[in-house]
C-alpha cells in the first residue's frame, strides 16, 4: 500500500502543486519522492512509500536501465510477478513486483499487460518514447485511484481525492475530481507541451470472466462439473491459493478478526498457511468492540481455537463519536452504512499501528457481495435476481466496502489484503449455477459454510454463526451502534434543519438526521464534492429505511431463536 500522485501539463508552479501530494502522506509513512519528467517542466510524479517488498530498491517512480523511456508509479501487489518473470525470462533490475508491468508492456502493449496481472493495483505508466500515458485499476478497485482532467489537457492523478481537490489550473477555479473506474485502463496521448488528450477508455475485465493470467497460474488442477463435492473441493483449493499468494511481503502479517464467518475463515486459513511457510512469528489477530459485543466473544473463541496472538480493543460510544470527523475525512464519503462500519475499523487500525509491528493486514472484505451474505438476500425473488444483485454489489465495491477497508487502514499506514476478492476464487464462485449460491434453510452463505464444514478450521458455532454486520456486531444487541449514533445526532440536527435539507443539499438529499450530520462533516472537508457518492447503500427487496441488519425482520427472528 502506497500513495501515488502525478501531474501532466500543469500551468502552475510545480513546487506549489506538490504540496497537495502531502495530503496522502499517511499512505506511505516510510519514504517519499517527487520527480520531474525529463524534457517536460510541467510534469511530475509524487510517491509516498510503505515498504512492504524490497525495502532497498523499491522507491518510485520505477525506472530501469533497459527501458529509460518508461516511468511507472503504482500502488498494489502483483502476486504472479515471479511466475511471469520466469515464464518470459525477463531480467529484473529490482525485487519489486511492479517491475513486471514495465517488462510486459514492452513485450506486448498495455492491454496484454494489464490482463496478465494477478493482483490489486492502480498505476500511472508514462512512455516518453511513444508519447503515451496509461492509467489502470484492478477489477474490484481494491486499490484506489482518482483523476482530474481539464478540457485543455491538464491531468492530475492520485490515490485519494484529497490529493487533488486543492490543485490550481488557469482554465477552471474548480477541478472536477472523480474516481477512476475499476476494471478499466485509459490511454492518453502526451503532447509536446506536457498536456494530454484521452484516446480511449477500455473495460478489460468483468468479474464473471476467468482472468487471462489463469493460464499461467500454479493452482492445483480444478475438477470439472458442478456436483456439490466437486465444487466444494475446487473452492477450498482456490481459497487456499488466494491466501497463499498474498503472503508476499517483507513485513509482519496480521489479521482482522470479528468472529464472523468471513474474517474467521481468513484467519484460520492464514495461520495454517503461515505455519506451512515456516514463518517465525505468531499470527496477531485483532478484534474491536464495546462491552458485551457479540463480535468480541466470537473472535475470542476463534483465536483460542486456532492459536493466534489475539488483541482485543475496547472503545466506548464517546470515543466512537469523536472519531467521526477523522473517519469521514479519511473516507471521502458520507454514505451512512459506510461511515458506521468505518469507525471500528479506523480505531482498530490506529491501535495496530501504535501498538504492534504488524503492517500487512488480512481481512474478509468482499465475501458478502460475492457469496450473497447480506441478510436481505433471503428475500430475493429468484436465484437469477440474487445473482444480478451479487454482481451489482461487486461492481460497486469501490464506492462502499472496499473504500472503507482501504481508507481506514491506509489512514494509519497499513496495507490490507482481501483474499475473497481473488480473481480466480471470485470468477469461479460466480460461474456456479445461481441456485447453488442462494441462502438455504434460512442461512446465508450456505455453500461457503458447507465447503469448510469438515475441515476442522473453525468451531461449528462460528462456521454457522448468522450474519452480523460489522457496525452492529461491535456493540450489544440491546444498544446497537446505529442507535447510539441516532440518539447522538438527534441533539445535533433539529427539525428545522431537516425541513431545509433539500435546499441545502439538493443532490443526494439526506433523509435522516444521521445522514444530515455526516453530510455536514463531509461538506466541511470537501465542499461541492457530493457527487463522489452516486447513491446511498441500502438493502434491496425489503423496503428498508435503514441499512442496519438489526432493523430487518429476518435478523430479529433469528435473534429470538
UniProtKB/Swiss-Prot annotation:
Q: List every position bearing Phosphoserine.
A: 557
Q: What happens when the gene is disrupted?
A: Mice carrying a gene trap insertion in the gene express 20% of the normal level of mRNA. The hypomorphic mutant displays a number of defects that mirror ASNSD syndrome, although the phenotype is milder. Mice have structural brain abnormalities, including reduced cortical thickness and enlarged ventricles. Mutant mice also show deficits in learning and memory. Mutant mice do not show abnormal motor activity or seizure activity.
Q: Asparagine synthetase domain: from which residue to which, for each copy? A: 213-536
Q: Where are the transmembrane segments?
A: none
Q: What residues bind ATP, as annotated?
A: 256, 288, 363-364
Highest taxon, organism lineage:
Eukaryota
Q: Which GO terms describe its biological process?
A: asparagine biosynthetic process; cellular response to glucose starvation; L-asparagine biosynthetic process; negative regulation of apoptotic process; positive regulation of mitotic cell cycle
Task: Give the molecular function GO annotations.
Answer: asparagine synthase (glutamine-hydrolyzing) activity; ATP binding
Keywords in alphabetical order: Acetylation, Amino-acid biosynthesis, Asparagine biosynthesis, ATP-binding, Glutamine amidotransferase, Ligase, Nucleotide-binding, Phosphoprotein
- What does the record give as the reaction this protein catalyses? L-aspartate + L-glutamine + ATP + H2O = L-asparagine + L-glutamate + AMP + diphosphate + H(+)
Q: Residues in the active site?
A: 2
Q: Which leading EC class covers this enzyme?
A: ligase
Binding locations of L-glutamine: 49-53, 75-77, 97
Pathway field: Amino-acid biosynthesis; L-asparagine biosynthesis; L-asparagine from L-aspartate (L-Gln route): step 1/1
Task: Using the record's annotations, give every residue carrying the modification N6-acetyllysine.
Answer: 385
The enzyme's E.C. designation:
6.3.5.4
Modified positions (Phosphothreonine) in chain numbering = 545
GO cellular component terms attached to this protein's record = cytosol
Q: This protein is called what?
A: Asparagine synthetase [glutamine-hydrolyzing]
Q: Which organism was this protein described from?
A: Mus musculus (Mouse)
